[in-house]
Swiss-Prot record:
Keyword Cytoplasm: yes
Subcellular location: Cytoplasm; Nucleus
Compositionally skewed regions (Basic and acidic residues) per UniProt: 195-206, 717-735
Species of the source: Debaryomyces hansenii (strain ATCC 36239 / CBS 767 / BCRC 21394 / JCM 1990 / NBRC 0083 / IGC 2968)
Family: Belongs to the SQS1 family.
Residues annotated as domain R3H: 629-692
Domain G-patch residues, every copy: 765-808
GO molecular function: nucleic acid binding
Chain intervals with Polar residues compositional bias: 43-52, 284-304
The name this protein goes by in its record: Protein SQS1
Record Pfam families: G-patch (PF01585)
Cross-referenced PANTHER family: G PATCH DOMAIN CONTAINING PROTEIN 2 (PTHR14195)
Record's keyword terms, sorted: Cytoplasm, mRNA processing, mRNA splicing, Nucleus
Cellular component aspect of the GO annotation: cytoplasm; nucleus
């Protein structure tokens, strides 16, 4: 028999017994509630059940609101709305704000986007004003007048036939009538003033009509008041009603007459004033009508002088750039004669006109005629052809006639120059006038001096080239050109850019105007022919000399232009002047100049390296800061600096050997940072970046100390250390070995058969060993040993043996 409660029908349900066992799990006690709330069940995250009693929906009224029971946070809550999409933590918010501060907080107002929102309704205060006036009780007569004034001028004004007052309310009739009267009086004056301002109603009509309208309105108001009072009192009679009807009929007839008069006074002008249009649109007469080609009758000079009143007469009339020959008639009027069609035909076939023969008194050439005068001249010629009924097609005549002879050569030259300026090469345009000139920030480069030579140099201040923002250094022009081209300066704008940054430093070439004071100008053509003949003779002589030249070009004694050779290495390097025949002073001077040049070149290279090193330190570039090797203390220092630097999110270490990269990765883990190995081969390096754990936990300095006590030096694998660096850090091993051999060697030289130690001195009496032997009974010349058993008194002699012939 299975045990009771041993089988479970639903393993996911609460504990407290199986489905077929005890009934302890059926009831929800406090203990069971705690178990379900601990999160052990798989339904963790679902909303917890509540004990709120929900009434039946049928028992509620229609206007009762039932709130939703949900423990989830609404998506539209303030907490969710404060979060940006994709960033749920404060560190991510801070990083996002820091990265986009240039585009948000520091962005100038003129560069921020502007949003235009279209209004839902049209704002028209005048339309609202007219609506309010219409509701306030304006008579229909004036309302129609206002509508006609606001309508377009093409529509004719329509005046209603019957003016009837609109009563505002029935409760307060007396007050309403008084308000209507006051309003009508003010509206009449305003409307009449508007009409007079527009020029549509005369002053006389305004005065008469306004008085009539006011009287009629007052009479109507009085009659209405009387009728209303009679209605309230209940005193009405048949005779009075008939009389009132008769009065109303008379008033209507009078109102119709007033309306007819207003219609006659109100006129819309659709045609306009002809005189004003004539002044604004003058009709230009034809040029041919203004020019008369008929000659006046001849008159005597005395009559002309008498008519002129003694005034000076100039026969040449200058109009702009045109000079005309004039004549005066007997009436004192000046006339001129223009060329006929035949004369123009002769000009088109024979060429330009000889002005000196035709008009000797003219000061200017006919070629100075302007374009406007030339156009008028063509109109005149066309008029002459129409009047003369020439059997020549106008198109053919215009094509055959050379009208361009009137244009001056100077004007053509000016036009050519203007065209040349309009089609100027973009490279010649001043820098800063094209859109592509703003791709590079010119303020990054500053030049204060220029030095020309074999390699042009510029005294430049540039942080990326010199490594300093305040220091000027001499930089080759080629290096500067490569830099600006890489930063965005277009190649076709390079010349304009160089002229712009060196403006004021290079003297512009002054254009010399030749005065030909030293040049002989011949008055006849014979001298010119003689000069041409002499040039031909010189050219022939040069050709004959080259043909008769027997010696080749290589045999000519031309000094060489190759560089001087050097000899020696290192500090002993100097010029090789042995093959040159120079005196001693000249040799020493050349050698000194060469050494000064080498020292300047060496110091310049060192300054560049120092500037590059300082720039790398400022930008936290470890490749520049550690060119050859890193110490374990340097690695720990860089990690500590990177941890407290809020402006950097990542740091790249130089390429190290595999053990060095593992050491860097191990230290990054101790600092709670993320490490990534990048690159392959000799270019493999470790990239370290910060993450969330970096700010939540402290570094494990005990583990970092253990690593720092291991391998101390880590060399870069992408750079080879030079000999100077090895000697400065590790010492010169070759010299150290040579020094050790020199210390062990002796200056004495041995020969074949020499006795070893023959010249050695005797052991002194102060020697400790000799003192002990003397106390034991030893004396000088005796052998060592006890009595009866003493050794030899003479020591064994050792001789030097160098040869290999055997013993002798």
């Amino acid at each position: 028999m299975p045990k009771r409660g041993g089988r479970k029908s639903h393993p996911k349900k609460d504990k407290g017994g199986g489905g077929g066992g005890s009934n302890f799990g059926r009831f929800k006690t406090n203990k069971n509630k705690k178990k379900t709330g601990m999160g052990s069940s798989k339904n963790h995250g679902t909303p917890r059940s509540t004990n709120i009693d929900i009434p039946e929906l049928m028992d509620l009224d229609d206007n009762v609101y039932i709130p939703e029971i949900d423990t989830k946070v609404s998506q539209s809550s303030m907490k969710n709305l404060s979060r940006r999409p994709g960033r749920r933590h404060l560190y991510e918010e801070v990083g996002y704000t820091d990265k986009h501060i240039e585009d948000t907080l520091r962005q100038p107002l003129r560069n921020r986007p502007i949003e235009f929102v279209k209004a839902k309704q049209v704002y028209d205060p005048s339309a609202d004003l007219f609506k309010k006036l219409g509701k306030s009780g304006i008579p229909k007569v004036h309302q129609d007048l206002l509508d006609s004034m606001n309508s377009p001028p093409s529509q004719e004004a329509h005046v209603p036939e019957s003016p009837i007052l609109d009563i505002l309310s029935e409760e307060s009739e007396d007050d309403a009538i008084d308000e209507v009267v006051a309003h009508l009086a003010s509206s009449n004056t305003s409307l009449d003033s508007d009409l007079v301002g527009r020029g549509e109603i005369s002053k006389t009509n305004d005065e008469g009509e306004s008085d009539d309208v006011e009287e009629e309105i007052e009479e109507e108001v009085e009659d209405e008041n009387e009728s209303e009072h009679n209605e309230h009192r209940g005193i009405e009679s048949q005779t009075e009603s008939e009389q009132d009807e008769q009065d109303e009929q008379d008033e209507q007839d009078e109102a119709e007459e007033v309306e007819e008069e207003e219609e006659e006074a109100f006129i819309i002008d659709d045609t306009g004033d002809a005189e004003i249009l004539k002044d604004h649109n003058p009709v230009k007469p034809q040029t041919s009508l203004l020019i008369q080609s008929k000659l006046p009758k001849s008159s005597t000079q005395n009559d002309i002088d008498n008519i002129g009143g003694g005034l000076d007469y100039d026969p040449v009339l200058n109009i702009g750039k045109v000079s005309l020959q004039t004549k005066r008639d007997e009436n004192g009027q000046s006339t001129t004669e223009l060329m006929s069609v035949n004369q123009l035909n002769k000009i088109s076939t024979k060429g330009f006109i000889d002005e000196k023969k035709m008009l000797p008194n003219m000061e200017k050439n006919v070629s100075d005629i302007s374009d406007d005068d030339f156009g008028g001249y063509k109109d005149y010629i066309a008029q002459v052809m129409r009047d003369g009924k020439l059997e020549v097609d106008s198109d053919e005549y215009e094509s055959e006639t050379n009208f361009d002879i009137m244009a001056s050569s100077s004007d053509n030259d000016d036009d050519d120059e203007d065209n040349d300026e309009g089609e100027k090469d973009p490279s010649e345009i001043e820098y800063g006038f094209l859109p592509e000139d703003y791709e590079f920030d010119v303020s990054q480069v500053s030049i204060s001096n220029v030095r020309f030579g074999i390699n042009n140099q510029l005294y430049t201040k540039c942080a990326e080239l010199t490594g300093s923002d305040d220091q000027f250094l001499w930089i080759d022009e080629d290096d500067l050109v490569d830099y600006v081209l890489s930063k965005g300066v277009r190649e076709h704008r390079l010349n304009s850019f160089m002229k712009f940054i060196t403006k004021g430093l290079i003297d512009e070439e002054a254009i010399e105007v030749p005065n030909y004071s030293d040049v002989y100008i011949s008055e006849t053509s014979e001298d010119e022919e003689e000069g041409a003949n002499s040039e031909d003779e010189n050219l022939a002589a040069m050709i004959a000399f080259t043909k008769s030249q027997q010696q080749s070009f290589m045999d000519l004694d031309i000094p060489s232009t190759e560089r001087l050779k050097t000899k020696g290495k290192g500090k002993k390097k100097q010029l090789d002047l042995d093959r040159m025949q120079l005196d001693i002073d000249m040799r020493e001077s050349l050698q000194d100049q060469y050494q000064v040049h080498r020292q300047a070149k060496r110091s310049k290279k060192q300054r560049r390296e120092d500037a590059r090193y300082e720039g790398g330190i400022a930008k936290h570039d470890l490749l520049v800061k550690y060119p050859y090797s890193l110490h374990i203390k340097d690695i720990c220092y860089e990690f500590e600096t990177f941890l407290h630097d809020t402006s950097r999110d990542s740091m790249n270490f130089p390429p190290l050997d595999p053990h060095g990269n593992k050491t860097v990765i191990k230290i990054s883990n101790f600092y709670n940072m993320k490490s990534l190995k990048c690159g392959t081969g000799l270019k493999s390096f470790v990239k370290v970046s910060k993450n969330r754990k970096t700010f939540h936990y402290l570094p494990r300095y005990d583990q970092i100390g253990n690593v720092s006590r291991q391998r101390p030096i880590f060399n870069r694998i992408d750079q080879k250390r030079p000999k100077d660096e090895i000697t400065r850090s590790d010492g010169n091993s070759k010299k150290d070995r040579s020094r050790g051999r020199n210390k062990s060697e002796s200056s004495a030289q041995s020969r074949e058969g020499d006795i070893v130690g023959a010249s050695a001195p005797e052991i002194g009496t102060n020697n400790i060993g000799r003192k002990l032997l003397e106390k034991l009974g030893w004396s000088k010349g005796e052998g060592l040993g006890a009595h009866g058993n003493k050794g030899i008194s003479e020591p064994v002699v050792a001789k030097i043996k160098k040869s290999k012939t055997g013993l002798k």
